[in-house]
Swiss-Prot record:
GO molecular function: DNA-binding transcription factor activity; transcription cis-regulatory region binding; zinc ion binding
Binding site for Fe cation: H88, D90, E109, H126
Localization of this protein: Cytoplasm
PANTHER family: FERRIC UPTAKE REGULATION PROTEIN, ZINC UPTAKE REGULATION PROTEIN
InterPro entries: FUR, Fur_C, WH-like_DNA-bd_sf, WH_DNA-bd_sf
Protein name according to UniProt: Ferric uptake regulation protein
Outcome, altering C49S: In strain: F3031
Biological source species: Haemophilus influenzae (strain ATCC 51907 / DSM 11121 / KW20 / Rd)
Region feature DNA-binding, mapped onto this chain: 1-85
Record text on subunit structure and interactions: Homodimer.
Length: 146
């Protein structure tokens, strides 16, 4: 049990439970990945960990409300979660295999600031999702077979 995770859960007002600690550890061990509740459930099922799907949904929703994870609705409004990043990034999503690539681009960031200033809006946050198809069909085949 990670002492840091216990402190984090206490800090955001969540009770320390085995499912919360287990799900948090999974998210931390896969910082650049995006998981649906079903993905998390299947991983635990394969590991022989007895955490129910309803519990996974509930914990991920609690983590989202506590800003431990961020919820995205990439694929047809299906929620996926990633550990709350320390630095801003945007996403490119393949419509065929669902692979998510993270990127940062200073030109895009600057242009968004210019546009918000033009309209007199003080920009707080934003999300950029770019959708397309993998240029390497083998990449999609590999992801779809998993």
């Amino acid at each position: 049990m990670s002492e840091g995770n216990i402190k984090l859960l206490k800090k955001v007002g969540l009770k320390i439970t085995e499912p919360r600690l287990t799900i948090l550890a999974l998210m931390q061990n896969h910082k650049n990945e995006h998981f649906s509740a079903e993905d998390v459930y299947k991983i635990f099922l394969e590991q022989g960990c007895e955490i129910g799907l309803a519990t996974v949904y509930r914990v991920l929703n609690q983590f989202d409300e506590a800003h431990i994870v961020i919820r995205h609705n990439f694929e047809g409004n299906k929620s996926v979660f990633e550990l709350a990043p320390t630095e801003h990034h945007d996403h490119i999503i393949c419509e065929d295999c669902g692979k998510v690539f993270e990127f940062t681009d200073n030109i895009i960031e600057q242009r968004q600031r210019e546009i918000s200033e033009k309209y007199g809006i003080k920009l707080k946050t934003h999300n950029v999702y770019l959708y397309g198809k993998c240029s390497d069909i083998n990449h999609c085949d590999e992801n779809n077979s998993k």
